[in-house]
């Protein structure tokens, strides 16, 4: 129990293994590198969004505008390519727009002190409206093969974009756990006042979280355009909720200061894995949100129960030394049960 709570991403990993085992038992052909590669390819967009959402949530904030940012940046790379710009320039253009969108969210939250949920609900509509105004509501089609080729498998079923996603996961996880600036995210989310007293650049850290979140949303938009080959006018709609759900499933606390990027990665992979269940059982696509929501609620309820049990255990250990006959404090003797008072 204590291991699961200290390593929150472990629960997501165990859930992935359990679901994978069930699927293999139902269909042995599911056990293959091709299947894993397919699931990973399908999860890349959600993984990128979960990484960004995790950074924001670690600082005790939330961003519900990333779906619109994905659409806006996918439009940006598509329009730039169709206007004759090279692929690197087009991708940098999309990344710049994502960074600006994220920084604007950060300015509203950090600079103007607007609650994050309110500020990003506003920019959710703002960025979606900017996307539709830019294109006149039309789809962006005819994207060049140079962009589409980035999603084609090259090694072990993994595409160049997939390798870039894995690199971002690893470098992000290392940065958060091994560097001072990475640990600042945890300090800000855990105790804002204490972080200020310790000299942490609180406002800069929160601004950085929102800005990186916007850039990762831009990366997700590039991956979307590459995988699909065109950009519909509703690109990214609803992805913000899935990103938050993936983080929660992976052990990122909504109260800030707890979780890892590996957990966010595993949560996104697990949610994508649920889609394969629908295909295997030939269920309609609209079951996806229902099943994902059901799983999320189950994880939250289980996590809450485990936390309560651990809290009771720690409280018993704390006060056990005050009980007669327990000098060392190691042996926990339960307190006598109180009789229920009659009203």
Swiss-Prot record:
It is found in: Cell inner membrane. It is a multi-pass membrane protein. The keyword Protein biosynthesis does not apply. Coiled coil: none annotated. GO terms for cellular component: plasma membrane. The chain crosses the membrane at residues 13-33, 38-58, 61-81, 92-112, 114-134, 154-174, 212-232, 251-271, 283-303. InterPro entries: ABC_transp_permease. Pfam families: BPD_transp_2. Residues 321-343 are annotated as: Disordered. It comes from the Bacteria. Keywords: Cell inner membrane, Cell membrane, Membrane, Transmembrane, Transmembrane helix, Transport. One of its GO terms (molecular function) is transmembrane transporter activity. Belongs to the binding-protein-dependent transport system permease family. AraH/RbsC subfamily. The complex is composed of two ATP-binding proteins (LsrA), two transmembrane proteins (LsrC and LsrD) and a solute-binding protein (LsrB). Part of the ABC transporter complex LsrABCD involved in autoinducer 2 (AI-2) import. Probably responsible for the translocation of the substrate across the membrane. This is Autoinducer 2 import system permease protein LsrC.
């Amino acid at each position: 129990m204590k291991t699961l709570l200290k390593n929150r991403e472990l629960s997501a990993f165990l859930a992935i293994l359990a679901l994978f085992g069930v699927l293999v038992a139902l269909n042995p052909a599911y056990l293959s590198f091709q299947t894993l590669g397919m699931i990973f390819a399908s999860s890349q967009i959600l993984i990128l969004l979960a990484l960004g959402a995790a950074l924001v949530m670690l600082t005790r904030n939330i961003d519900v505008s990333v779906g619109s940012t994905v659409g806006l940046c996918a439009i940006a790379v598509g329009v730039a390519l169709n206007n004759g710009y090279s692929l690197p320039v087009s991708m940098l253009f999309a990344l710049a727009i994502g960074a600006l969108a994220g920084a604007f969210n950060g300015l509203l939250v950090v600079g103007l002190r607007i609650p994050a949920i309110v500020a990003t609900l506003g920019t959710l509509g703002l960025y979606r409206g900017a996307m539709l105004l830019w294109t006149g509501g039309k789809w962006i089609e005819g994207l060049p093969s140079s962009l589409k080729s980035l999603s084609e498998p090259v090694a072990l079923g993994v595409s160049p974009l997939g390798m870039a996603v894995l690199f971002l996961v690893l470098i992000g996880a290392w940065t958060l756990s091994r560097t001072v600036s990475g640990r600042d995210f945890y300090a800000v989310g855990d105790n804002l006042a204490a972080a200020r007293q310790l000299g942490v650049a609180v406002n800069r850290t929160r601004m950085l979280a929102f800005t990186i979140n916007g850039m990762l949303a831009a990366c997700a938009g590039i991956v979307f355009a590459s995988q699909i080959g065109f950009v519909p006018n509703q690109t990214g709609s609803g992805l913000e909720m899935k990103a938050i759900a993936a983080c929660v499933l992976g052990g990122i606390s909504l109260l800030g200061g707890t979780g890892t990027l590996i957990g966010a990665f595993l949560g996104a992979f697990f949610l994508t894995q649920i889609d394969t269940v629908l295909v295997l059982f030939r269920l309609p696509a609209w079951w996806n949100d229902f099943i994902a929501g059901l799983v999320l609620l189950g994880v939250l309820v289980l996590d809450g129960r485990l936390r309560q049990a651990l809290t009771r255990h720690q409280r018993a250990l704390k006060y056990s030394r005050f009980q007669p006959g327990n000098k060392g404090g190691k042996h926990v003797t339960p307190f006598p049960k109180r009789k229920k008072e009659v009203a």
